[in-house]
Each structure stands twice: as structure tokens, then as C-alpha cells.
């Protein structure tokens, strides 16, 4: 599985270099290629993002699944916690 991940990463970087190299004869900046490769590798290593479903406890909007927000149970003091809601 690791070899497949590395192979996909290398293919992605090579494809990016080829596509950028064809535009007006310019070569891509080395830093851009390295930064793109690092971001892609990090995303592959992390796997799919896990999100908090509706009505589950949360601390921040970033935890909630798409279309949901982390909101208080009771608005005045928010002592009882928050859940992901529409």
C-alpha cells in the first residue's frame, strides 16, 4: 500500500511538472513543485477527513460536517455544550 501511495505521489508531481512546462516554455519554480508534493503527500497520509455528524457534541465549526455549524444548546450562557446543527 505504501508503494502505491508513493507511486501515485511521484506520478502526480511528474504530471504537474509536465503540464506547467508546456505553458509558454517556462519551467515551474522548484519551490512550487516541492510545496505541491508535500501537500499532496500529507493529504494522502492523513486519509479522508472525519467530520462530526448532526446533533453530535463539538467544540468548533471545523469539526462539523459540511452544511453544519457548532452551536450552543442554550444561547444565554452556553454552559451545557455545543452540537453540530444546521
From Swiss-Prot:
Modified positions (Pyrrolidone carboxylic acid) in chain numbering: 50
Subcellular location: Secreted
Signal peptide: 1-23
Stretches of the chain forming a coiled coil according to its record: none
Keywords recorded for this protein, A-Z: Disulfide bond, Pyrrolidone carboxylic acid, Secreted, Signal, Toxin
InterPro entries: Conotoxin
PTM entry text: Contains 4 disulfide bonds.
Propeptide section residues: 24-49
One GO MF term attached to the UniProt entry: toxin activity
Superkingdom of source: Eukaryota
Tissue-by-tissue expression: Expressed by the venom duct.
Gene Ontology cellular-component annotations: extracellular region
Family per record: Belongs to the conotoxin O2 superfamily.
Free-text note regarding domains: The cysteine framework is XV (C-C-CC-C-C-C-C).
Protein name: Conotoxin Ec15a
Amino acid at each position: 500500500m505504501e508503494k502505491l501511495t508513493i507511486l501515485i505521489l511521484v506520478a502526480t508531481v511528474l504530471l504537474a511538472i509536465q503540464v506547467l512546462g508546456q505553458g509558454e516554455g517556462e519551467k515551474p519554480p522548484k519551490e512550487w513543485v516541492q510545496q505541491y508534493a508535500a501537500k499532496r503527500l500529507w493529504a494522502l497520509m492523513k486519509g479522508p477527513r472525519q467530520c462530526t455528524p448532526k446533533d453530535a457534541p463539538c467544540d468548533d465549526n471545523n469539526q462539523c460536517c459540511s452544511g453544519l455549524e457548532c452551536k450552543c444548546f442554550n444561547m444565554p450562557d452556553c454552559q451545557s455544550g455545543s452540537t453540530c446543527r444546521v
